[in-house]
Amino acid sequence: MKPVSVLLIGLGRVGSRFYEKFRELGESRVRLVGVCEIDERHPLLQRAREGGVRVYENFEEALAPSENPVDIILDTTNIPEVKARIRHRLEETGNHHTVLLPLVASYLLWHMAAPGEDLPENHVQPGY
């Protein structure tokens, strides 16, 4: 089975946990094709670069049409405007392959990646 390619947006508490979990799973299962983080001094960015993960300053750059489209976008910013802009960018580029994970699916992943640990309070608003 081919690995699932994932673009991770945001490396806060939630995004960092997902980053670590995806790396633990290994490239044969999850291919982390990129991370987007506005804090250019975030400690995981250097590790990502060293591990061959592309680092983007913004998701628009990461979503440029490519021969190898991203399977899943995991937006952990919890900012509704970011999700709206991602959806718009996917439409604008005619990308019908990539799935922007709904927030509820992120909850499921969180419970699998961090069993017994509650989501941070600012990550509990419903919505797509």
Regions found by a protein language model. Name each.
Residues 80-128:
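Rossmann-fold NAD(P)-binding glycine/threonine-rich loop
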Residues 25-50:
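NAD(P)-binding Rossmann-fold cofactor-contacting core
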Residues 2-22:
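Glycine-rich adenosine-cofactor-binding loop
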Residues 49-52, 93:
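Short, structured coil segments at secondary-structure junctions
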Residues 67-72:
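Short acidic/histidine-rich motifs immediately flanking catalytic phosphotransfer sites
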